[in-house]
Amino acid sequence: MSKGIRRMTVHDAAGVHAVELESFATPWTLDAFEAEMTQNPNAYYVVADQDGIVGFAGLWHIADEGHITNIAVKQSHRGKGLGEDLLTALIAVGRALGLRAMTLEVRVSNTPARTLYEKLGFQYVGVRKRYYQDNNEDAAIYWLELEGEDL
């Protein structure tokens, strides 16, 4: 991993949860992140500075596909390329695992995230109607094909 990105440990859970609370209307619980560390210990990554965790990203490995569960950067650190660095790291992990493709959902209104996903090669493939529970917003579905790419 580059630019200070490293695998998440159970000791990072509180810092990751703080970023999650700041970033999402329906955040995961601290218990959920701690459970991820025991059930999925190799698929969450963080970036930190001297003050602690400033961003994180997660990946579920399901058969030959990867599902990006969440990616977030503290508001004070947005616009510095950390989200792109985290997503690029997850793509590298997916390739190392031999995944065929990666997918994610994002709020249709989240233009900055959608722009980033498209910049990194993700293709819009559809919509999940009323996906987000807080306001029934639709989710845009994106896929990135890894199979056949030059690794």
Language model: regions and residue ranges:
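Conserved catalytic-core motifs of GNAT/GCN5-like acyltransferases
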Residues: 105, 118, 123-140
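Acetyl-CoA-dependent GNAT
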Residues: 3-76, 87-89, 93, 97, ...
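Short glycine/proline-centered loop/turn elements that form peptide/ligand docking sites
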Residues: 87, 110-113, 130-135
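Accessory recognition modules or surfaces
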Residues: 84, 137-146
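Active-site acidic-Proline motif in GNAT/NAT acetyltransferases
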Residues: 74-76, 80, 108-110
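Conserved GNAT acetyl-CoA-binding A-motif
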Residues: 94-105, 128
